[in-house]
Amino acid sequence: MSVETQEPFKRINVDEAKKLADSGIPVIDVREPNEYQAGHVPGAKLVPLNTFLRSPRQHLPASGPVLFICAMGQRSAVASEMAAASGATDVYNIEGGTNGWIAKGYPTEK
């Protein structure tokens, strides 16, 4: 018998993420500066994962939902887990990350 544990954050695809980002939900990009500068989701705030892990509350919005993105969805899952552990209750991890965002043809900023 296996026991499934519920993750404290929601995994969403890039299509769902685009809708949420367009509605004004903040996006935190946890990639490294050189990755971010090569292209990122419009309006995304750069907070490299190591920086976020040192002081997650400092980088989270005071309330409301937040989206995390990286290149593929792994680093952002770590950040999402830490955000939830720090008290955030409406946390989304963008599966497929920036690579998936670009593959869909969604806009980026440099």
Residue ranges and their predicted role:
Residues 1-26, 33-65, 74-110:
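Rhodanese-like catalytic fold shared by cysteine-dependent sulfurtransferases
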Residues 68-69:
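Short, surface-exposed ligand- or partner-binding patches at beta-edge/loop junctions that are enriched
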